[in-house]
A protein has these predicted regions:
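Cell-envelope/glycan interface and biosynthesis
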Residues: 21-160
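Secretory targeting and sorting signals
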Residues: 1-21, 25
Length: 160
């Protein structure tokens, strides 16, 4: 498999084929609002991620944002790269939304790293309103818990 674009560009596109190709230098602190991928997140989502990161830190877990807000052009680039990687639009859509459908473009989705942070957030995220949305993306979270702190059932993938 060849990596197209930047390494961090594929963070949301690659899922079950192996570990996400993200170097720690590509990750942003949830508190670095000068980074547009963080600073352009929906304010409620950003606050929830920051609260979760603080709580995770108390448990010895470092939480980073590997992908947050994305421009429509960047989202389209991710989709185009995924089409090349997976061989078809339909296969790519299992991993990457269109710019019109992506919650990243509206600042309402965030990808969290590393693996221990993903695991921690899957177990504890609902306390902050944060829910894993797709079964094949352990790192993708949205502010989706209901008033009782329950997350919706997982969707199989982004095309669902």
């Amino acid at each position: 498999m060849r990596l197209l674009g930047t390494v961090s560009a594929l963070a949301g596109a690659l899922t079950l084929l192996g570990p996400r190709p993200i170097a720690s230098a590509d990750a942003a602190s949830p508190f670095d609002v000068s980074d547009p991928t963080v600073g352009r997140l929906d304010p409620a989502l950003l606050a929830a991620v920051q609260q979760a990161a603080t709580a995770a830190s108390a448990d010895g877990i470092t939480m980073t944002i590997t992908s947050g807000w994305r421009s429509p052009e960047f989202q389209q680039q991710l989709l185009d790269d995924a089409i090349q990687t997976y061989g078809s639009y339909n296969a790519a859509r299992q991993y990457v939304q269109t710019p019109q459908q992506s919650k990243h473009v509206s600042g309402q989705a965030v990808d969290i790293g590393g693996k221990s942070a993903d695991t921690w957030l899957i177990a504890n995220g609902a306390r902050f309103g944060l829910c894993q949305i797709y079964a094949n993306e352990l790192w993708h979270f949205e502010l989706a818990a209901d008033a009782h702190g329950n997350c919706p059932p997982l969707l199989p993938n982004a095309a669902s």
